[in-house]
């Protein structure tokens, strides 16, 4: 059979499987491709193909991740699955696999386990906005009341991390049955029900181009007789010639007007998300603007120095530190295009952080940076990456 070409007319959504080790994340991923392949909406990927995930490097961090893609009637999905717990931690913190929603896999036989809790916490910290639950191995639990208790426990756990536990869809089934082609309600039917829940419960993400304009400043130069140009890649939104923008971060926020947009030496009416542009700025001196600041739609982003973050510290093998660090650690934090020094406060009861750990920390920067929740950063020492993090909440 000739491979069906994926139609790109459907909306695209990024999802992934999360949950405790051996609860069936990879089996479920394989089962989804199996069931949808029979409908011509996916290419079947077996357990071993997914489990032997290739290693990728993201910001100098080695992460093993498997990517599969499939379609439902409504959408096209890119789905990530990781073999090891550490890979999930790294993936979620670096944003290597940006998830618009996640399928939390919980074994009905075990109920929520430590990594179930940790993955829910990580999803909350790094801004995975929606979770759908697959209660796996339901065929191994004969007692209906026991199943209901496990479901209740999952809902309470989700609510305790500020997810809407009462509203989240929980689908009971058996990934293994689905993978083995069983057509009953715990097999194929459960997989189709799960995909229907994902279709309906996880909303389509807002496209980058529809968000408020933001461009990190990479370089600045002056053109005699014309003024100052800031160059960079538009991260989100659109900027049109004649629009007012703010210069945010490092110094006091300033307003200016974009009097020209240039790309590949051609003048344009606008710059859009993904474009590498030069923006000509009215009345701005060369020394008024620098790398590390951002151009943004007025009022859309503010500068901050103190925030909470979830961070992953590289192992020695990944090129990270060989020794732990303690409270008051002062590395550089690389945001978008520049390094800023900051001080790390460890949570109460944590004496030190070892290479390979992930930890929730409070960070105080010496210079304000334009930020919002979900912003990713690298932790560096003298230009060498020793960690990665994501802003989970802003303090001031």
Swiss-Prot record:
Signal peptide region: none
Localization, UniProt: Cytoplasm
Protein name: Elongation factor Tu
Any one GO cellular component localisation term in the record: cytoplasm
Record's keyword annotation contains rRNA-binding: no
Molecular-function GO term, any one: GTPase activity
Keywords annotated in UniProt: Cytoplasm, Elongation factor, GTP-binding, Hydrolase, Magnesium, Metal-binding, Nucleotide-binding, Protein biosynthesis
EC number(s) from the headed UniProt entry: 3.6.5.3
Residue ranges constituting the tr-type G domain according to the UniProt record: 10-206
Top EC class for this record: hydrolase
Subunit structure: Monomer.
Protein residues bound to GTP: 19-26, 81-85, 136-139
Family note: Belongs to the TRAFAC class translation factor GTPase superfamily. Classic translation factor GTPase family. EF-Tu/EF-1A subfamily.
Principal place of residence: cytoplasm
Region (G5): 174-176
Annotated spans, G2: 60-64
Positions of Mg(2+) binding: 26
G4, as annotated region: 136-139
G1: annotated span: 19-26
Free-text function comment from the UniProt entry: GTP hydrolase that promotes the GTP-dependent binding of aminoacyl-tRNA to the A-site of ribosomes during protein biosynthesis.
InterPro entries assigned to the protein according to its UniProt record, in alphabetical order: EF-Tu_GTP-bd, EF-Tu_GTPase, EFTu-like_2, EFTU_2, G_TR_CS, P-loop_NTPase, Small_GTP-bd, T_Tr_GTP-bd_dom
């Amino acid at each position: 059979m000739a491979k069906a070409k994926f139609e790109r007319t459907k909306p695209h959504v990024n999802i992934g499987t999360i949950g405790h080790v051996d609860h069936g994340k990879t089996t479920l991923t394989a089962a989804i491709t199996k069931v949808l392949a029979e409908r011509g909406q996916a290419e079947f990927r077996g357990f071993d193909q997914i489990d032997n995930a290739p290693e990728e490097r993201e910001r100098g961090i080695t992460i093993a991740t498997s990517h599969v893609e499939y379609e439902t009637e409504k959408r096209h999905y890119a789905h990530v699955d990781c073999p090891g717990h550490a890979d999930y931690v790294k993936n979620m913190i670096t944003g290597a696999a940006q998830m618009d929603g996640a399928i939390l896999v919980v074994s009905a036989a075990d109920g929520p386990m430590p990594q179930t809790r940790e993955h829910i916490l990580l999803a909350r910290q790094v801004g995975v906005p929606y979770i759908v639950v697959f209660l796996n191995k339901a065929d191994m639990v004969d007692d209906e009341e026991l199943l209901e208790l496990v479901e209740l426990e999952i809902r309470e756990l989700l609510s305790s991390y500020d997810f809407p536990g009462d509203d989240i869809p929980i689908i009971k089934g058996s990934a293994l049955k689905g993978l083995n082609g069983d057509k009953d309600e715990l097999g194929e039917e459960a997989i189709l029900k799960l995909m229907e829940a994902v279709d309906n419960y996880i909303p389509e993400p807002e496209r980058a181009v529809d968000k408020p304009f933001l461009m990190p400043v990479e370089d600045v130069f002056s053109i005699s007789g014309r003024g100052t140009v800031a160059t960079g890649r538009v991260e989100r939104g659109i900027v049109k010639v004649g629009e007012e923008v703010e210069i945010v971060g490092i110094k006091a926020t300033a307003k200016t007007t974009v009097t020209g947009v240039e790309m590949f030496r051609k003048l344009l009416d606008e710059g859009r998300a993904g474009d590498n542009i030069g923006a000509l700025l009215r009345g701005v001196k060369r020394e008024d603007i620098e790398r590390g600041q951002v151009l943004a739609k007025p009022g859309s982003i503010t500068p901050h120095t103190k925030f909470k973050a979830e961070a992953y510290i590289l192992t020695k093998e990944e090129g990270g530190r060989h020794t732990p660090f303690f409270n008051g650690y002062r590395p550089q934090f690389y945001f978008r295009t520049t390094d800023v020094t900051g001080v790390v406060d460890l949570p109460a009861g944590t004496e030190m952080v070892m290479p390979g750990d992930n930890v929730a920390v409070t960070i105080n920067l010496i210079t304000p940076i334009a930020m919002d929740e979900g912003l990713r950063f690298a932790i560096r020492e003298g230009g060498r990456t020793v960690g990665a993090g994501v802003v989970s909440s802003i303090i001031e």
